[in-house]
Amino acid sequence: MSRELTVSLAAIASQALTFPQLNQIHAQLIVFNSLPRQSYWASRIISCCTRLRAPSYYTRLIFDSVTFPNVFVVNSMFKYFSKMDMANDVLRLYEQRSRCGIMPDAFSFPVVIKSAGRFGILFQALVEKLGFFKDPYVRNVIMDMYVKHESVESARKVFDQISQRKGSDWNVMISGYWKWGNKEEACKLFDMMPENDVVSWTVMITGFAKVKDLENARKYFDRMPEKSVVSWNAMLSGYAQNGFTEDALRLFNDMLRLGVRPNETTWVIVISACSFRADPSLTRSLVKLIDEKRVRLNCFVKTALLDMHAKCRDIQSARRIFNELGTQRNLVTWNAMISGYTRIGDMSSARQLFDTMPKRNVVSWNSLIAGYAHNGQAALAIEFFEDMIDYGDSKPDEVTMISVLSACGHMADLELGDCIVDYIRKNQIKLNDSGYRSLIFMYARGGNLWEAKRVFDEMKERDVVSYNTLFTAFAANGDGVETLNLLSKMKDEGIEPDRVTYTSVLTACNRAGLLKEGQRIFKSIRNPLADHYACMDLLR
């Protein structure tokens, strides 16, 4: 094979769009020449394998065929294992090369350190001995490992050792403080930084958004002397993740007006923000804009679109995208499609899809259990929960238990409910406010108001929804006195009653024969609704 043809094949290999295409080109190189046995060419092919996520047996075969692998081909293999989340293989390769007296370089050391997880910090002494601590890329990974697996103070000690700090050193340290929730130190270090760059500003925006301080996040965003698309994405994500859809859309419109070109991540954030609204009209407008802008729809954008259509109950559009994705489907895609079916009450299609999934996680199980519970099939929800435990591929979490407790409540089966509570206790599953509300609902529906009240009193923070759960229970049982006491407590805590609150209170007064109290409560309502007037008709 001529050198020109060999170079051409190598260039074509780097442009291969699928693994079968790469396989064919590789076969040609093997048939006509022994070049793949050389480190340079093997390195290029392994890089293609990484990009196309080729099977590990195939990539390893290429690596093993190299007669004398140099540092470039070894680094390519490190990168492949890292991209494929094969941490153990990274460490095995490191051990093999070390035995041969070949140590990683500044490029591969970070991959090895990350793969070692919490043991990555043990590489610090070796890194310093080999002189790689001078490389910002290497020392930044060590600092990040301390933040993730030990403490931010340990990372700060490494930071303080650096005589000539780069911007990346400051940014890793500031980010570390945010990860540990230390806003004060993050702000202090940001102000100490000799020159704030785009990354440091973006880290601050992300940090404030993470602690739900969107006012300061926006202040830092507006103060930025120069913004990148990543900065815009950070602010957009802050709004979207905290439920401020309108603010996210306004900012996105500003972005377009100023001529900043959104990337795929931007579109995923904006689409996800619109998903919270579940507004078909907004969905149509966004899809039209995406078509006009000729957005490149990668698998992440398509998955976000699928989820948005599913939440708008447009199951046909969601299914069309699901089918288009083909082999690009991931767990998020499958779970979004299953949730779409459960949302419209089509549990048969949801179950069929679940049964054909190549791989499941806890979200997959939770989607089906919640679907059965919310669609009036409580017994099937419990049965499916038992299947989840039996299969053992996913461990039930807090979300699982909320649906299971709700199902027990609908069945008014306190004996089963007690078994579920015992399971929660034994498996140390912590319940949030939604979990406590489900527990209150379960006891209330089963008629055990004392236990429902006890759980309510255990809640660290109560909101109007928590109160309404208990109000509804008291109303159903006609306990007017306890209802009035609870209303007083609610107001003492500064929580404003809503429509549901007053309907439950008036219903309880009606059933308990508390005519005067009911009339007094009715007069205190600023804008009574039809439900409230209906309750008063019963009180006369």
Swiss-Prot record:
The gene is PCMP-A4. One of its GO terms (biological process) is RNA modification. Belongs to the PPR family. PCMP-A subfamily. It comes from the Eukaryota. GO terms for molecular function: RNA binding. It comes from Arabidopsis thaliana. InterPro entries: Pentatricopeptide_rpt, PPR_At4g14850-like_plant, TPR-like_helical_dom_sf. Pfam families: PPR, PPR_1, PPR_2. Keywords: Repeat. Gene3D superfamilies: Tetratricopeptide repeat domain. PPR repeats lie at residues 70-104, 105-134, 135-165, 166-196, 197-227, 228-262, 263-297, 298-328, 330-364, 365-395, 397-431, 432-462, 463-497, 498-528. This is Pentatricopeptide repeat-containing protein At1g14470. PANTHER family: PENTATRICOPEPTIDE REPEAT-CONTAINING PROTEIN.
